Amino acid sequence: VRTFYEPDEDEEFEAAKDLIVRRCAAWAAERGSRADEAVLAAALDSRHVSVDGRLAYWGRDQVRRFLCEYVPRHIIADQDVLERAPESLLTLLRHLADTGLLDPRGLDPDALPAAISEAAADYPDIVADPRRQSLAKYWTLLALDHGVDLEDQDALDRFQQDIDAGRVPCDHELLDELAIAQFLGEDQEDGRAFAQPPVALPPPAEVAEAAARSETVRRLTLLYEWADDQPLTAKGRLRAADARELAALLGVESPQMLLAWARTAGLVRVVKGRLRRIAKAAPLVRDPEALWRRAFERFFELGAEIGTGDSILSEWFDEIIPDVLNTLYGMPSPLPVARLQETVWLACQEKYLVEDDEHWRAGVDADLDAAFAALATLGAVELTHGIADALYSSDLRPSDDGDEPPPLPPEVCERLLVVLAEPGPLVHLTPLGTSATRARMLADGRDVPLLGELAGAPPAGLLGVLAQHYPEEEAAIELAGWLSAHDGDTEPLLQAVRDCPYRTRASAMLAVLAGAHPDGPALLTRLRHDRVIGPIAMTALVEEGRLSHDDLTADDQLAMLTEAMLALLEMGGPEAVHDQLATLPTPAAHELVQAVATSPHPAPTALTDFHTLIATPLLRPH
């Protein structure tokens, strides 16, 4: 089972959700823990529709979002189920931890109860507030209150007619509030963000040194020291002589943008017509790295001060520029500014619904250039000039099979193919800019892997994350770091594979371990004879062509057959198994099911599922 599915993998996600909920409910019953299946399923739903989509990643923000936003907004259940939702959530998270599914980059399992208790303090009042529900939930509850069968379309149609005719009493004031919330998007879930590649960051000392070298940090520090009760004009601007003095001090033509930046960063303020430094900002100014990060965070509020200040980009600066930096994040080589100009212009056209006007386009391009110049002076990006890497033009032509259309309109692709053939301005994030951009994405709840962050992860968590979120090269680097921190011992990793009750998960864990380990092929060959891992290892060896069916004994073949059926049940649910069996004559299907059900396969949890969902119903005498 995976704990990450793309938004369009509906069937795969639903099968995984059903499996995890079923296993968790059984696990909870054995321990006497609360586990309402509606809450378990909703918790997984809430993570699937989130910005990062990681079902098993839970921190304080995710816990609070589920209990204080998702449950009151969406879940329709008995009052007792709603009241005890925090208990059911804790059971789910404990089950994820116990089975090795919990993402180690979230809260430690020991810290989860406190996070749930913290959110649960506000939960009763929030879940009882009708203004927290969605419009869809309001109408669904109203229909249920009137005895409408939600599975009966005719009954639903009659109920709608009664509403239209005014025969169903409604809370119109509440409806107005819910409709406004829906219109403003307040009741909408976050859209899934693009996955980001794992990156490496320099040591903290190097980051601090880079911040101290920033020209913008130097200028903001000088400005802070200079701004000692300076008089302003009636329009709130520096007097001409003072502006010239400050410009000379800072080494700029005009100090206006830096003044705005300093005010936005909380370094100076205007008091009774005079510019004064803020005393509480003194510790910040003395810490170059802290000042750099404050300046970076406040940069996105400077749209009106960057460039011309009156282009479309300035209006949407705080939305578009972060997306531009996210695009630069993790790129293996400098990105051509021309390509970014095209995508930024397309984004601006969507915001304003303007045609491809040369005047507006020139203003957007100029402001984007000005933004890059300011970020370069800050030290967040580096600007160079040259031929762009072929990577940035390789997707501009239609693919040979036509399956993947270019990501941009045809006329834009044609324009870029011409421009990118010649040298031009290039931009990439500096290590400092990468660090700051990553911090922003982390704050937004996005998945932004960092090479080295899993060195202390539990074995199951390490392999699970590598299998789902790391490319091969980065997985090998991360695995090497983990082994280095654990005396090169692979046995804990192999034991994690053995302990995993989800066979498809165990297979993925073994695959990433063998693929990233220097002695992976030899490891797989040795594991062929492992009592628990053997069926998975043999399957991998056969798929790789390093083991033929002639090399397999009858017991080996039965073990592999059982492994395949258990994997099919996990991935597709009972329906997938029934579909497969339907391709066989009935006697052969029954014989196969009997063989799997009585197999000595070393996966008791998966075999129990097979007995319950497949073998018992199919082989029961009629």
Spans of features found by a protein language model:
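Short amphipathic alpha-helical interaction segments
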Residues: V81-T91, L250-T264, E358-G386
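Amphipathic alpha-helical scaffolding segments comprising HEAT/armadillo-like alpha-solenoid repeats
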Residues: F372-A374, L378, R446, L450, ...
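N-terminal core-binding DNA-recognition domain of tyrosine recombinases/integrases
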Residues: V21-R84, S88-V127
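Structural detector for internal amphipathic alpha-helices that build alpha-solenoid repeat scaffolds
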Residues: G464-Q468, A475-A485, Q495-R498, R505-G515, ...
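Charged, amphipathic alpha-helical linkers/stalks
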Residues: D444-E478
